[in-house]
Amino acid sequence: MSAERTLILVKPDGVSRGLVGEVVGRIERKGLKIVALELRTLERSVAETHYGEHASKPFFGELVEFITSGPLVALVAEGPRAVEALRGLIGATDPVKAAPGSLRGDFALEIGQNLIHGSDSPESAKREIDLFFPGLS
């Protein structure tokens, strides 16, 4: 099976709580390889592009404010069915509905600060990787 790539963001709440190592460790223990990793504070324009599909929703402004509020870690993981594997590892968007053992189930408390973002499809992964790591995909 060919390797697939996916983008993961450890959001500002995860960075400030010191959970980057936990996230990276779980990704690696899952059998995926990290091929790019960067600590950065997002510019508003990048955040607005990244979350563009939510632009008309009432929570868009709050989402952009949060994701640009402090440093985050952007990383690209690679392996067979990487998108699907990471979605399972991350857990449901709402931490209350996330399974125990998932990152959100274990470490997140509220939907607005849910620790981590993962691409939801191979197509989204390509678009997101191109935005965060131009030239990598």
From Swiss-Prot:
Active site positions, chain numbering: H117 (pros-phosphohistidine intermediate)
UniProt subcellular location: Cytoplasm
Keywords annotated in UniProt: ATP-binding, Cytoplasm, Kinase, Magnesium, Metal-binding, Nucleotide metabolism, Nucleotide-binding, Phosphoprotein, Transferase
Cofactor: Mg(2+)
Pfam families, per database record: NDK
Domain of life: Bacteria
Chemical reaction(s) catalysed: a 2'-deoxyribonucleoside 5'-diphosphate + ATP = a 2'-deoxyribonucleoside 5'-triphosphate + ADP; a ribonucleoside 5'-diphosphate + ATP = a ribonucleoside 5'-triphosphate + ADP
Its EC number(s): 2.7.4.6
Record keyword Coiled coil present: no
Annotated CDD domains: NDPk_I (cd04413)
Main location: cytoplasm
Molecular function in Gene Ontology: ATP binding; metal ion binding; nucleoside diphosphate kinase activity
Binding residue positions for ATP: K11, F59, R87, T93, R104, N114
Residues that span the membrane, as ranges: none
InterPro entries xrefs: NDK-like_dom (IPR034907), NDK-like_dom_sf (IPR036850), Nucleoside_diP_kinase (IPR001564), Nucleoside_diP_kinase_AS (IPR023005)
NCBIfam families membership: PRK00668.1
Similarity section: Belongs to the NDK family.
PANTHER family: NUCLEOSIDE DIPHOSPHATE KINASE (PTHR11349)
Function statement: Major role in the synthesis of nucleoside triphosphates other than ATP. The ATP gamma phosphate is transferred to the NDP beta phosphate via a ping-pong mechanism, using a phosphorylated active-site intermediate.
Protein name per its UniProtKB record: Nucleoside diphosphate kinase
Species lineage: Bacteria, Bacillati, Actinomycetota, Actinomycetes, Frankiales
